[in-house]
From Swiss-Prot:
The N-terminus is blocked. SUPFAM superfamilies: Trimeric LpxA-like enzymes. Residues 40-174 are annotated as: 12 X 5 AA repeats of D-P-N-Q-A-Y. This is Proline-rich P65 protein. Sequence repeats lie at residues 40-45, 75-80, 83-87, 89-93, 95-99, 101-105, 107-111, 119-123, 140-145, 150-154, 156-160, 170-174. The keyword Cell membrane applies. It is found in: Cell membrane. The gene is p65. The penta/hexapeptides repeats form a proline-rich acidic domain. In addition, a part of this region contains a perfect direct repeat. It comes from Mycoplasmoides pneumoniae (strain ATCC 15531 / DSM 23978 / CIP 103766 / NBRC 14401 / NCTC 10119 / FH) (Mycoplasma pneumoniae). Residues 7-25 have a biased composition (Polar residues). GO terms for cellular component: plasma membrane. It is a peripheral membrane protein.
Amino acid sequence: MDINKPGWNQSDQQATAYDPNQQQYYGDGSTYYDPDQAVDPNQAYYPDPNTYPDAAAYYGYGQDGQAYPQDYAQDPNQAYYADPNAYQDPNAYTDPNAYVDPNAYQDPNAYVDPNNYTDPNAYYGYGQDGQAYPQDYAQDPNQAYYAYVDPNAYQDPNAYTDPYYVTSTDHNAYYGQVDNVPALEASDLAYEVTPQEQAAEQELFSEPETKVIREIHEFPFEKIRSYFQTDFDSYNSRLTQLKDKLDNAIFSMRKAIDTVKENSANLQIMKQNFERQLKEQQTQRLTSNTDAEKIGAKINQLEERMQRLSRTMESVEWTKKEPRQEQFDPRFVDPRNFNNYVNNTDTMMSMFEKVLMMNLLRSTTPVQPPVQYFTPQPLTASPRPVYEEPISASFRRRGYRGDEFYE
């Protein structure tokens, strides 16, 4: 959006005073507003809850100089964290399908609700398809093996039980056993074989591949020969086809050369005829001397005009570097000037305009960008930087402690 808009704007259809000391932007596309009045430094820091929320929340400036709302990077002049005393509506709706930016900044010091904590390092297994998925039925082997089961919970006698999903009250039972009774074989998904384990298994238990060692007379020479023979045959046929094509091409080229020779001979004869006719006409022309003088004067006059025109064209030539397609409304085109807008042709009028424009360009400076004014904002305390200890993979630099190092 252009920040150098004049006061009167066609889309607004209303006059607004243009104050160069203010940055004026479009809010909803229809009215101006002033973002500098968004924060009054003399007011309390949090907005008055009884007022309508400010439509001109903090705006940042993009690479292209456009203003856009930075909801995700808050105003650095505001307090860094949200107001801890702000009222939280317990019944507020949270969209479970809302998009979560995986690259969003996570504050390491953010408060974690102990009743709503999900461990990001929870144990994940890999399925047959290589996808990671939470293994609720085969829990982290480093944890207690079974989750706590309430013995007094109501058991539905008709409920479907998955034979692979073993829930046992016996916490010492093996997986796949209920109260030490062998159950059905556990599913493949209950455990995973790592590639290292697979490799070790291969090394320990696999047998070497049997290699058939042939005697020399057992090799199928005839098969090999016939296999290559088919190749040679196909190449041979393709080469003969190519040769035929080339022969045809040479023949047609020779024909073409002959016809060209014939035509050039005919043209030579025609040229001689024309020259003869021209000489005959010249002898008939310019009977009197005055005609020649008149024609000479006319030629001189034309030459002068050509020189003058060529000088003008040289000074104008830079305008024709890139022919551009003019965008114009035919209703507003001056009919006398119409040729300027068609095909980029040069009329006397357009040439006159170009020379005028050049003189104007010589006598004026280019448009300067407007000055930008910034209103000062009060600075608030920013979080103190944390310096990490540098990693030094080296000897200790301050002498040797005791006799633990000998040169």
